[in-house]
Amino acid sequence: MSISLLCCAAFPLLWAGPVNAGVTQTPKFRILKIGQSMTLQCAQDMNHNYMYWYRQDPGMGLKLIYYSVGAGITDKGEVPNGYNVSRSTTEDFPLRLELAAPSQTSVYFCASSY
């Protein structure tokens, strides 16, 4: 019996702003077994209201998972199934993978804007 693994790479997507400001995304890399859960953290220090989570599958463009227009306000994007988000503060927008599946093997991007 083989063990199937799900791999995701998380890279911050930075937007223009003040010097030394940006989006911080952790962890940078993570490998999960099928069925495991994990949270990708995203924090921004630019006081932006809008925050976004995207995924990019091999050979494809970006797909919006979830977005937020302010603290306490979140909405689904194109591919929300299997994910959850929360936005308790302006700075933080964590993305939770509930039960890792091979179809979620992807590069994940967090972004913010005014």
UniProtKB/Swiss-Prot annotation:
It comes from the Eukaryota. GO terms for cellular component: plasma membrane; T cell receptor complex. The keyword Signal applies. Glycans are attached at N84. Residues 22-114 form the Ig-like domain. Keywords: Adaptive immunity, Cell membrane, Disulfide bond, Glycoprotein, Immunity, Immunoglobulin domain, Membrane, Receptor, Signal, T cell receptor. It holds the Pfam family V-set. It comes from Homo sapiens. Disulfide bonds join C42-C110. V region of the variable domain of T cell receptor (TR) beta chain that participates in the antigen recognition. Alpha-beta T cell receptors are antigen specific receptors which are essential to the immune response and are present on the cell surface of T lymphocytes. Recognize peptide-major histocompatibility (MH) (pMH) complexes that are displayed by antigen presenting cells (APC), a prerequisite for efficient T cell adaptive immunity against pathogens. InterPro entries: Ig-like_dom (IPR007110), Ig-like_dom_sf (IPR036179), Ig-like_fold (IPR013783), Ig_V-set (IPR013106), TCR_beta_variable (IPR050413). The gene is TRBV6-6. GO terms for biological process: adaptive immune response; cell surface receptor signaling pathway. Gene3D superfamilies: Immunoglobulins. Residues 1-21 form the signal peptide. This is T cell receptor beta variable 6-6. The keyword Glycoprotein applies. It is found in: Cell membrane. Alpha-beta TR is a heterodimer composed of an alpha and beta chain; disulfide-linked. The alpha-beta TR is associated with the transmembrane signaling CD3 coreceptor proteins to form the TR-CD3 (TcR or TCR). The assembly of alpha-beta TR heterodimers with CD3 occurs in the endoplasmic reticulum where a single alpha-beta TR heterodimer associates with one CD3D-CD3E heterodimer, one CD3G-CD3E heterodimer and one CD247 homodimer forming a stable octameric structure. CD3D-CD3E and CD3G-CD3E heterodimers preferentially associate with TR alpha and TR beta chains, respectively.
